[in-house]
Structures are given as C-alpha cells and as structure tokens.
C-alpha cells in the first residue's frame, strides 16, 4: 500500500529521512504517527527508525542531542524542529518486566519491528509513502483489532505496561482486542505489580480521558487486571457504577476522572489513595476538592462561601459529574455566585495581619489568625464591605 500524499508532519520531516538515506542508510517513519496517519487522526510526534547507529546518525547532522543514546535514540534538530531518530534494535531478556537487560543495534527493519507491542504500531513508512507491513497491521487497522506482534505472552512478559497500553488503545481508538492477545493480557496481569505506579498512572489516566473510556475500562475490569493495580483489589463491582454515567459523557479533566473513580469507590481516604498512586499534592488536593463539592451538592445548594473556598473550574467539573448522573444542575448559579464575590482570595482584602498589629496592638498568634479569618468570611458572605473604614469599625465593635 502507498500513501499518495504524505501528511504535512511527514513532509516537514522528509529532509531528515533523505539525509540519512543519502549517507547510505535506511530510514523510515514508524510507530504511532504512521498508525494515526492511516486513521486520519492528529499526528503528535513523528518518530524515525534508521539502520544508522547512533554515532553514525550524529555524523550525518550538524545539530543533535543525546537523549537516549544507550537505547539508540538521537534527537536531531532540523528546520527548527526536533525529531527522534532511533537505530533499528533488538532487545535481550527483560530483567524486571520493564527493561531489557541488553539492547543490540541491528541493520534490519524487520528485527526492529517485531519487538514492538501491537501490529498497528509495527508499521513503517518510507519517503515515497510506501508502507511496510510485516505483521498484517493494515488488516488489523481496517478491522479495528488490537493484536500483539508475534507471541502475545512474550510481548507482555517483556514489558507488562503493554497490558495497560492495550486497554488504553481500546479506549482511544475504539478497537477490539484480539482473543489471544486479551487472553495473554489476562494471564500476564499479575506482572503489573512489577511496574512503577507512576507509569501505570499515566496509562490509566489516558484511558479515563479517552473518548471510548467505557470500552477500555470494561476490558480492564472484566479481564481481572484491575486486581493488580494499586489499592484497587476487589474494586470491580464499585467501579462498574461508572458505566451508569450518561452514555455520551466524557471526562473533561484528569482530576474529574479520578474524583469520579473515588466517588464510585466510596472511599473516605481520598488523600491516602492518591498518595499510593504517587500523584502530586496539588493534583490530590484538586481531586479531593471535587469529591467534597459533589458531597456538598448532594446535601444542599452551593453558597457564596463554597464559591470562595473552591476554584470555579472544580465547582463546574463537579456539576458536570452531577449532570452525567442525571441529577439536577445549575451552572449559571455557580457563575452568578462567583461574580457576586467581593474578593476571591484573602490577598484581595484591604487589611492584613501587619496592619492589625500596628493599629490595634494584636500580637502574632491564634487570636490574630482568628480575627483575620472572621473578617475574611464576613466579607465573603456579604456582611462586611472590603473597605478599610468599615473593617476597622467592625474590629472596634468586636473589641
């Protein structure tokens, strides 16, 4: 098969391929960019595979950076763009289900492609638009099938994260897992416990944010692989409640997706759960805030103080979750409450602790903090204007 017209992303990278070929080596576009071009999806990163060894690649180009030279990857700077050029390679035994004990550089494209995860990612494209398909990846693309390259169990034993990538590709592409591939993913799922939490989080997060997240999540649950993810053993029945969200609902942000997951789990230990997943403190706080907002909304309407205490984007994300649950929502009320706030942070108050110590003799300590918090919420609730004269009169009355 031949592409009559190369996508612009490939056309811009053609000088890289042409220089490598002019030096006497082979070079091809490979991987996800080729797959996405055939599916007419947006192309993000253009990856190039070459028969030139790293030092040979560096001699071809004026500007390069060693970004992963031990694995054969050189970053080539060409026409104000960056391209990763990776030498054809084979990999030895994987020592920890994550990393090969040894990477060997080879001159054979076939040897390079057969170590890849799925057939749809094992396609190569030359400078003339000619596709190289050694593992029937084109057929699988046409039939919307995810099939491991070669023997499925070998691929997942090499790198167990490929199991999560399989579920993520389902969620992203709306493809079906080929039966032998799914069986191997199920059998190899215990190996996920060998993978770093951070790598699993990235794949799970991409799955949840994908347009067909239900498909990927359902396969993750029914395969039993969910049992081997951090702190999710025995969670299948609870997580299946996510399928009760509106059928066309997609998560708008990572924190919203993880909040929905935690709400389904009905856990009271949101922060502990996210520490296990090794997320940032900021991310964990935003997820916890959405969980709190949804809980508040199940009991009462939001107030001005709620709109002050929580970021408006989190309030809106929580309301979206309610809407997906078929509950009554009021987005305009959130915007109106936010617009009615006199201040949006304590930094906007016309007084601070230093002024109160100077003008009223307050000492540093809990009492000063208490009066500042009282002033802050009096302003937020609309009981006190954010005006110096009014605030000082309020303090004098309280004293």
Curated annotation (Swiss-Prot):
Where along this sequence does the record place binding of CTP? 32, 35, 116, 159, 162, 165, 168
Q: Which residues bind ATP?
A: 32, 35, 116, 159, 162, 165, 168
Q: What is its EC number?
A: 2.7.7.72
Write out the entry's keywords from A to Z.
ATP-binding, Magnesium, Metal-binding, Nucleotide-binding, Nucleotidyltransferase, RNA repair, RNA-binding, Transferase, tRNA processing
* Needed co-factor(s): Mg(2+)
Query: What biological process terms from GO does the record include?
Result: RNA repair; tRNA 3'-terminal CCA addition
Amino acids binding Mg(2+): 45, 47
Q: What class of enzyme is it?
A: transferase
UniProt xrefs under SUPFAM superfamilies: Nucleotidyltransferase, Poly A polymerase C-terminal region-like
Q: Could you tell me one molecular function GO term of this UniProt entry?
A: tRNA binding
* Pfam families per the UniProt record, alphabetical: PolyA_pol, PolyA_pol_RNAbd, tRNA_NucTran2_2
Which reactions appear under catalytic activity for this entry?
a tRNA precursor + 2 CTP + ATP = a tRNA with a 3' CCA end + 3 diphosphate; a tRNA with a 3' CCA end + 2 CTP + ATP = a tRNA with a 3' CCACCA end + 3 diphosphate
Name the NCBIfam families on file: PRK13299.1
* Functional description taken from the UniProt entry: Catalyzes the addition and repair of the essential 3'-terminal CCA sequence in tRNAs without using a nucleic acid template. Adds these three nucleotides in the order of C, C, and A to the tRNA nucleotide-73, using CTP and ATP as substrates and producing inorganic pyrophosphate. tRNA 3'-terminal CCA addition is required both for tRNA processing and repair. Also involved in tRNA surveillance by mediating tandem CCA addition to generate a CCACCA at the 3' terminus of unstable tRNAs. While stable tRNAs receive only 3'-terminal CCA, unstable tRNAs are marked with CCACCA and rapidly degraded.
Additional remark text: A single active site specifically recognizes both ATP and CTP and is responsible for their addition.
The record ties this protein, via HAMAP family, to: CCA_bact_type3
Return the similarity comment.
Belongs to the tRNA nucleotidyltransferase/poly(A) polymerase family. Bacterial CCA-adding enzyme type 3 subfamily.
Quaternary form? Answer: Homodimer.
Q: What is this protein called?
A: CCA-adding enzyme
Q: Which organism is it from?
A: Streptococcus gordonii (strain Challis / ATCC 35105 / BCRC 15272 / CH1 / DL1 / V288)
């Amino acid at each position: 098969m031949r592409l009559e017209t190369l996508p612009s992303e490939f056309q811009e990278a053609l000088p890289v391929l042409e220089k490598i070929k002019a030096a006497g080596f082979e070079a091809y576009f490979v991987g996800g960019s080729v797959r996405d071009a055939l599916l007419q999806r947006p192309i993000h990163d253009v990856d190039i595979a070459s028969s030139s060894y790293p030092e040979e690649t560096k001699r071809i180009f004026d500007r390069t950076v060693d970004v992963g030279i031990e694995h054969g990857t050189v970053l080539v700077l060409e026409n104000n763009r960056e391209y990763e050029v990776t030498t054809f390679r084979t990999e030895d035994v994987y020592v920890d289900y994550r990393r090969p004990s040894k990477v060997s550089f080879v001159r054979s494209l076939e040897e390079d492609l057969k170590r890849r995860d799925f057939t749809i990612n094992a396609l190569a494209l030359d400078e003339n638009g000619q596709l190289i398909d050694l593992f029937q990846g084109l057929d699988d693309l046409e039939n919307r099938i995810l099939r491991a390259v070669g023997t499925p169990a070998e691929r997942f034993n090499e790198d167990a994260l490929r199991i999560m990538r399989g579920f993520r590709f389902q969620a992203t592409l709306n493809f079906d897992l080929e039966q032998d591939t799914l069986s191997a993913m199920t059998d190899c799922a215990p190996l996920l416990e060998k993978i770093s939490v951070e790598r699993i989080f990235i794949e799970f997060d991409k799955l949840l944010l994908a347009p067909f997240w239900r498909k990927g999540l359902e396969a993750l649950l029914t395969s039993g692989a969910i049992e081997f993810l951090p702190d999710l053993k025995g969670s299948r029945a609870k997580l299946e409640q996510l399928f009760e969200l509106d059928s066309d609902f997609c998560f708008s942000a990572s924190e919203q997706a993880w909040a929905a997951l935690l709400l389904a789990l009905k856990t009271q230990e949101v922060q502990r759960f996210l520490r296990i997943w090794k997320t940032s403190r900021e991310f964990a706080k935003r997820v916890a805030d959405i969980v709190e907002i949804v809980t508040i909304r199940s009991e009462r309407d939001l107030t001005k103080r709620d709109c002050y205490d929580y970021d408006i984007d989190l309030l809106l994300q929580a309301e979206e979750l309610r809407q997906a649950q078929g509950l009554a929502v009021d987005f305009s009320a959130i915007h109106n409450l936010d617009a009615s706030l006199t201040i949006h942070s304590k930094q906007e108050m016309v007084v601070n602790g230093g002024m109160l110590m100077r003008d009223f003799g307050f000492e540093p300590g809990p009492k000063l903090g208490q009066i500042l918090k009282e002033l802050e919420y009096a302003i937020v609730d609309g009981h006190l204007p954010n005006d110096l004269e009014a605030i000082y009169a309020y303090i004098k009355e309280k004293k």
